[in-house]
Amino acid sequence: NDTAGHGTAWRVQTMSILHDMKLSSDLKVDPAFLMDLPEYKPDEKEITYYKAIMNRIPEPDRSRIKKIYEERGLLLREKRPAGKELLKYKYQWYMQDYLACVASVDENVGRVLDYLDQHQLTQNTMVLYTGDQGMYLGENGWFDKRWMYEVSMQAPLLIRWPGKIRA
């Protein structure tokens, strides 16, 4: 991106999908796939972070998730993408992870609402769902959410209280 005319924060950000997004810590590629590939080799901090992420996931989910992300490591080893080709993969994987997260939230909010309906609790229960500000989804080539620009200053809000608020 051309940084002329932008403030310091814009110029010094470390949110570039191509240059700053880490394969292991941000995209969950097992470091074992990358250790002998100099162009992708993760540093110790990235390896530690990856292990911390995986250790928080209980079995058998951890094995299932690692299998899903194994495809990424295999692709990197086989194709060794660089430049725009690597950017394309990173962005696709980032969006797949983001959309999987959104789908999971949708599914589980639905489970809560279904439970309330099935137990006749809907009319007297307010359900309020919100979250923090949104992520950059490739705008300006960025990911994450470190700066307060308009694109990321949106928060989800869902309220359901049929006994009090009309839909």
Model-flagged regions — what are they?
Residues N1-A167:
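Active-site-proximal cap/lid insertion segments
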